[in-house]
């Protein structure tokens, strides 16, 4: 390819990647699979590395993380970022309405109401449509320059779809609930301090001096306001939100306009329970005067706008009695104390246990068996013990002592210097083996259907397996003799194990359970090295050349493959016929021309897995039901999409019907 052809191809790839980024992260309507997107991004990065003169600040390649900063420099906002006054109930909202109307005598007032995302406020500046700066709110006048980090958030466009000379836009960076739970699970396994909630996780991720660390975290962002702007003058907040969406920003779909405060109050109260079904945390709603001319007339106090207020949800905390503290063992040997308490209802579910994380956590909070404790759900998803109600102690409470032996195998447990976690040192510990096998068989790894914790425990207790490689040497006859299995279940399990031999390399890499290596990194490693043997032979520098891999992960990968027993397991997998090479995606276009809408919770797939499956088979996924929708797939607790589908006469699929369509 000559230089002109290279330049043209780079521009074509950038345009395609910007388009598909917008479809996936903003519209929630992806048209291609992750694998196809990754292939285009790798081609772009490769071409830009060969021809660095063609790299531009708005290139999708610039999302992967730049140089490590020594510190964050301070930057001034073009216009101040104010905080909001709070309302804690209907009377506060009515008082806000009275103040607004008294300052706008004789005028009609509309309110635009939005969800209040619980994250980190950020400000972005675009010049001629290109992102040039990202900053934290800071003190409202100045903030910290986090440009390299915000570029890693794929919901933030590097280039606007309709460029204007200057735009300062404000929004909230956040971490989805599932991502927060997964991140804390990983940190707990590594003996690292946990984030208290998704807001802290988002803030901590964006304030990393190394952008590669931020890139590894699953962050997103909703935009909701502007500061300085040249080239556009919206008339209302509702119009502004539509315009931001047209520019390529992700804006929250849940927003309404009302002309009286009673309807505003009813709408706010309707979210008290509905919020728990959202994939992200909200801590209230924001009420804004809809007219921007009226906003300007109302102005600001020293701290906050007179035209907006935040309605805050009451904290949901329950008191209960701590019955016991048990210790569980994870796949890396980490001993985690767990609180067992009398049942309480939180965020719409009944809760009976919560992780106490480590010995230091218990000591800091002075938690004792028999205590009355206060419990909440961090990020509405993870139960946590907030505090002990010490004034209710009777003297019968018992202090908890962390065991220095593993509660499962009785092997020695140690706490290494600088770590908060105790670890079982016995590599043959049944608990570690079980968790390792369950991880190996999980959906994101080898996807062996029917091999969960109970079956893994049966296989280990019977002595049929001692590691995950042994799975490939099982017979249906052996498995059928296990309690509660039977011939049919045994045959299904063996068939699932046999089928997993043909998985692509990224699933195997993730299934090996290498510390710090998640699904995305496993895919990137597989695509880069193509063969497991090449990854094993690679040096740390070559591994670190992959955008999603940092120094700690590279060291962890090398340490894993330096262990003789791990290499022996890999040889055993090869001998059994397990694929160790990257398989290029084979196109099966059975769903070509079909558009699917998903509603409710699916039991066999996560939402993303179902979407990727549809895309990989040539179909499309939409976030809303219309006459163009081919099928609506319905899980548990479906929403209004099911009602709309029935009204339009759109075919409805149960989860089982969907499975048969895509898996047969």
From Swiss-Prot:
Swiss-Prot/TrEMBL cofactor(s): Mg(2+); Mn(2+)
Protein's UniProt keywords contain NAD: yes
EC number(s) stated in the UniProt entry for this protein: 6.5.1.2
A single BP term in Gene Ontology: DNA repair
Keywords, in A-Z order: DNA damage, DNA repair, DNA replication, Ligase, Magnesium, Manganese, Metal-binding, NAD, Zinc
Phosphoprotein among keywords: no
Active site: 116 (n6-amp-lysine intermediate)
Positions that bind NAD(+): 34-38, 83-84, 114, 137, 172, 288, 312
Domain BRCT: 586-664
Pfam families assigned: BRCT, DNA_ligase_aden, DNA_ligase_OB, DNA_ligase_ZBD, HHH_2, HHH_5, Nlig-Ia
HAMAP family reported for this sequence: DNA_ligase_A (MF_01588)
Family classification: Belongs to the NAD-dependent DNA ligase family. LigA subfamily.
Job of this protein: DNA ligase that catalyzes the formation of phosphodiester linkages between 5'-phosphoryl and 3'-hydroxyl groups in double-stranded DNA using NAD as a coenzyme and as the energy source for the reaction. It is essential for DNA replication and repair of damaged DNA.
Name listed for the protein in its UniProt record: DNA ligase
Species of provenance: Carboxydothermus hydrogenoformans (strain ATCC BAA-161 / DSM 6008 / Z-2901)
Gene: ligA
